[in-house]
Amino acid sequence: TNTATTPTATIAPDSIAEIEAAVQQARLDLEDAYFAAASDPGNQQLRQEFRTFYSPEAFGPLEDFLDDLLADGTTLRMSSDVPKSITFPGDFEFLGPKEARLRICRVDSDVVRIPPTNGRAEVIVDDRVVATLTDVLLALVEEKWIVTGGDRIMQWQERDSCDF
C-alpha cells in the first residue's frame, strides 16, 4: 500500500529554477549591501539598506559587527591580492512557497583596516582570507528574499575556496 501523500499543487521545474536564480541574486545583492555598509559603518542609509536583506533576528549579530567597526574606527576595503567570491556549490532546496535553503561558499578576503587620515598610512588590522560553507535559510517577505537564519557547515582559514 502506498502511504505517501500526493501534493495538491506542484511547481514546475523551470519555476523552481527561476526561484533559485532569484534567491541567488538576492544573496549576491546582500553581499554588495554588506560591503557598502562595512566600508562606511557610520552611514545610517547604507546600514538600513543592508538591514533590509535580513529578518530582525538574523540581523542582530551583523548590527553588532558594524557597531564594532565604528567604535574601533575601522572599515573594510577589498583585497588587492585575493578576490572575494560567492558561489553556490550545493543543492538549492525549496522548502515551501515562501521559504528556501541555499548552500553558499563565501570567500571573504575583505581587509579590515584603519583608513589613512591626515597623512597617516592605512593600518591593516586583519587581512586573512577565510572560506565559509554555509546553508542559508531565506524567506520571501514583501516580494524580497531575506535571510532568516542559517548554519555554518565548515570554515577554512587562508583558503580561497570551499573545495575539500
Language-model segments: residues:
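Amphipathic, hydrophobic N-terminal targeting peptides for secretion and organelle import
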Residues: 1-11, 161-164
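Core segments of small alpha/beta cavity-forming domains
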Residues: 7-81
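Generic alpha-helical propensity signal that fires on short helical segments
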Residues: 34, 41, 68, 77, ...
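Secondary-structure transition/hinge residues
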Residues: 35-39, 110, 140
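Short, surface-exposed linear patches
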Residues: 47, 83-84, 123-128
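Residues that cap or initiate secondary-structure elements
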Residues: 58, 108-110, 142-144
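Surface-exposed, charged secondary-structure patches
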Residues: 70-121
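Short beta-strand edge/turn micro-motifs at domain boundaries
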Residues: 101, 122-164
